[in-house]
């Protein structure tokens, strides 16, 4: 909060005047003490209040300071209340304004040189000057720019190109002129363009150990750049698995690289078991019921390989290609579903093993 500012004029109230005198007298002596210690000087204060009471303060010995004062005959600085009022008016500070130290207010050129000369300093020497801080550098997001990811492109290697190979749309502007004390800028414009964006993550080494020696370097760089920048270029590229490594045309001749490992990882479907070929006699024997004579043969209920609209079972229609069963014209079934009369020749032709084998060989030829 600080001390309340009061008007610098005579205090009419006796009690308030006494309290103010006690406080400010102690403050004056405290300031004299600080000045004597900091600046190594001798100070003597002689105060008479309104009741003609004497109050004195001496940094060392009052008699010695007074003796030195009476014997001093050279020109010296001497001020009164009138001089203090004129100094405050020149600085634009009223009597009721804030209390400032002499070095805190504005100074005239003459007073500045006199003060420097009194302190032993050389006015001709340059004084250090303070400049404002340099403007902050732009953030990496503004320098490199955050581009929105394009649409999904599952076509292949379109997203494998790194972002550094494309020309950057950002061009750093020329730096503004700094304060007059700085001749060169703190950072050169080339420093902004030479920086590369930090990697998103470090890829695992040794994944492609089965690559040839000639393709390990560029192929590894291609995979690294794809893993680093695939999230920025194409967010949907990771959802579609790529083809195996051996299917690329730029690999050397011979067995494709990684084909054996790919075949070991992917299980092959088992082939169905094949049945041994059977002859016509064994087929007819397997279809003959037990206890039936060799001349008896039941029509096969197995559908024909290429049935027509008028037949449903082998032996009941015209012979088809590859069918081992002989049929006779008079014994086939009519389209209407009625069974015609069978002649003895039809039963004999169907039941004769010799004719059955001959027709089977003829069909196979």
Swiss-Prot record:
SMART domains: MADS
Protein name: Myocyte-specific enhancer factor 2B
Species lineage: Eukaryota, Metazoa, Chordata, Craniata, Vertebrata
Tissue distribution: Expressed in skeletal and cardiac muscle and brain.
Stated role: Transcriptional activator which binds specifically to the MEF2 element, 5'-YTA[AT](4)TAR-3', found in numerous muscle-specific genes. Activates transcription via this element. May be involved in muscle-specific and/or growth factor-related transcription.
GO molecular function, one term: DNA-binding transcription activator activity, RNA polymerase II-specific
Chain intervals with Acidic residues compositional bias: 98-108
Positions of the DNA-binding region: 58-86
Low complexity bias spans: 277-289, 326-346
Domain MADS-box per the UniProt entry, residue ranges: 3-57
GO process annotations (BP): cell differentiation; heart development; muscle organ development; positive regulation of transcription by RNA polymerase II
Gene designation per UniProt: MEF2B
The keyword Methyltransferase is assigned to this record: no
Self-association state and partner proteins as the record states: Interacts with HDAC7. Heterodimer. Interacts with HDAC9.
Organism: Homo sapiens (Human)
